[in-house]
Regions:
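Transmembrane-helix signature of 12-pass secondary carriers
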Residues: 1-234
Length: 234
């Protein structure tokens, strides 16, 4: 069960590699169809990276409120929607919009999968499991490039984005069925049915299924103005 979770995280990372570089794989065909200048193409290529940055910055804090599982399901959904929208554009400006949406999803996936992988890996195999997960992005980029060449040759550049949307959508179904919540989130935030969910997880990974939730500790919130980071104290 633990390795299944690691494999799911690696596949998410693999599809991230494909989704992020899909525009690079199809840039020549898109530039030819819409008559783009180098600057316009550069904006499109940057749109996905902008979305990734925004997703990493703004979706990461959301995981502490709603949980890693809902965050990952939402992020994978955004990625699938962005890829699907990219396949049916009629103006290149819309491609920029959908690339931002895809990037948001990819950024959210990146901040969620590393935590899930680390938590569900055994101490003995944790380093190897994280390596497998991390390798997914590069493998997705390499295999995605070869896959994109074949698709474009037969069906055109839009098929690359459509294939990415379909694969990401299938992954979403798999995650919805089998992806568990973060153990740390269940024990620290203690959402509804947290104890039941923890015991189900424990049973699946071969542990005694009689876990009890620890006393919930309320964290004292403290705010530090950003300006203080530039003071002499720091």
């Amino acid at each position: 069960y633990q390795w299944m979770i690691v494999v799911m995280a690696a596949i998410m990372n693999l599809l991230d590699g494909f989704d992020v570089l899909a525009l690079a794989f199809t840039a020549t065909a898109i530039r030819g169809e819409f008559g783009l200048t180098g600057i316009e193409l550069g904006y499109l290529l940057s749109a996905g990276l902008f979305g990734m940055t925004a997703g990493s910055l703004f979706l990461a804090p959301l995981a502490d409120k709603i949980g890693r599982r809902p965050l990952l399901l939402m992020a994978v959904s955004l990625s699938a929607i962005g890829m699907l929208g990219s396949a049916f554009i009629s103006q290149y400006q819309w491609l920029g919009f959908w690339r931002v949406i895809t990037g948001l999803g990819v950024g959210g996936i990146l901040v969620g999968t590393n935590v899930i992988t680390s938590e569900y890996s055994s101490r003995k195999w944790r380093s190897f499991a994280i390596s497998v997960y991390a390798a997914g992005f590069g493998i997705g980029a390499v295999l995605g490039g070869m896959f994109a060449v074949m698709l474009q040759g037969e069906y055109g550049w839009r098929s690359v984005f459509l294939a990415g949307a379909i694969l990401t959508g299938l992954l979403l179904v798999v995650l919805f069925i089998w992806l568990p919540e973060s153990i740390d989130f269940l024990t620290s935030k203690q959402p509804k049915n947290a104890e039941v969910r923890l015991n189900l997880i424990a049973k699946k990974i071969g542990l005694s299924s009689d876990w009890k939730l620890p006393a919930k500790v309320e964290k004292v919130k403290s705010k530090l103005p950003i300006s203080q980071l530039f003071s002499e104290k720091y």
